[in-house]
Amino acid sequence: MIILYIILAIIAIVVGYCAGFFMHKRLIEKQTANASNSADVIVENARKQAETERREKLLEAKDESHRYRAKVEKELKERRAELQKQEDRLLQREDSLDRKDNSFEKRENSLERKEQKLALDQKHIDEQQQKASSLVEERQQELERVSNLTQEDAKNLIISETEAKLEKERALIIKEGLEDAEAEADQTARKLIAEAIQRSAADMASETTITVVSLPNDDMKGRIIGREGRNIRNFQNVTGVDLIIDDTPEAVVLSSFDPIRREIARIALDKLIQDGRIHPARIEEMVEKAKKEMDDNIRKTGEQAVFDLGIHSMNPELIKLIGQLKYRTSYGQNVLNHSIEVANLAGVLAAELGEDVTVAKRAGLLHDIGKAVQHETDTSHAQLGVELAKKYKESATVINAIAAHHDGVEAQHVISVLVAAANSISAARPGARSDTLQSYIHRLEKLEQISNNFDGVKKSYAIQAGREVRVIVKPNKINDLKAVMLTHNIRKAIEKELEYAGKVKVTVVREVRAVDYAK
């Protein structure tokens, strides 16, 4: 019985072991199958991700390739454009060199013709000398035969006659050569001047003394005048310009002989009209802004003139003075346009004669620089120009050209002569200058200068076409009683020093302002 239990137990153990073994085997197979499936999924996912990343990298590479290609194409395009510009410049330079070569070739041909003519003349002289020698021998023999002269006396007589004949022939040859040279020189000079004028021709317009300012409507006139005329009086006092308001629809007129002052007034009035707020404080503010804007315009004008002429390394103060020449006139001719024209003419003449073109243009541009400050003093513009050129370290050639362009001093360089010639050509063109406006402006400048010479005067303005001078005085130096005396003194000085028709009204303005701020 016990044995049976043992056997059953053993059988049960064996059966259990077998069952466990088979169960464990199936579990392992199942786990293996699951792991295999999971691995396949992971591999598939990895493959898909790798494919996605490969496509993304490919797209990025294509984008980078497109960007690089576009960049390269842009650089190539810019390079081609730059090369085209360089090629154009080279072509222009080549054309210039060709023209110079042609000019040199013409001169060389002219020299060859002269040399050939001289050779023929020399040959002719040699032949004449040979004939003279033969004649001397014949004369000597003849004289020895028919006269009682000694050989030495006969020799002296023949030599004297021969020398006289040769001297006459030589004088004729020299005279013909001089006439040919003078004719050719005159023709060459005319050609040079004509070419210079043709290559630098410029229109010239006479300068006026008024500026018309358009208004949006006629109601603006009343706002400009202000209550009891305070706005227009303040505007005229601050700017020194006559503001004329008449029946002209939607327009007012600014009148002043000083173009800079008139332009500042125009800019300020335009700003006031656009802003709409017109009162004394606003007027003064806009005038100050207009002065700053005018300074910028003057500087830019000077820089543009220097740039257009290809001039470099010029002092900024000189450039500013060049810009001021735009607002100065000489006998109705705009001084800046005249100076640019002289610079171009001098440059063309210098190029034809083989001189330094840049220095010639520089001297031509600066020859009237003294006129930018001449209204402040009685010194001649040539002397003022020399002082300015020395002050701003210009070369000796430029300084001499400025000093000599009106024959004030002796020209020490060829460029000085060229600048003087170019100045004469520019000034002598028909219609370039008008004396009437210049004399009128000179009279107004003299009127202001007389007033400014008195102690305590801050600034004076000639207005009403010279029929009135308005004098602004320093209130801390001139009281009310002194203002009355100053009026009489200025009147006497004007009567003594100035010639004029009619009457000149002298108005002395003394203004005291007290300003404080409430905090």
UniProtKB/Swiss-Prot annotation:
GO molecular function, one term: RNA endonuclease activity
Record GO biological process: mRNA catabolic process
Domain HD: 335-428
Gene Ontology CC annotation, any one: plasma membrane
Keyword line: Cell membrane, Endonuclease, Hydrolase, Membrane, Nuclease, RNA-binding, Transmembrane, Transmembrane helix
Residue segments, region Disordered: 84-113
Predominant place of localization: membrane
Recorded topology in the membrane: Single-pass membrane protein
Function: Endoribonuclease that initiates mRNA decay.
PANTHER family: RIBONUCLEASE Y
Protein name as catalogued: Ribonuclease Y 1
Organism: Pediococcus pentosaceus (strain ATCC 25745 / CCUG 21536 / LMG 10740 / 183-1w)
Gene: rny1
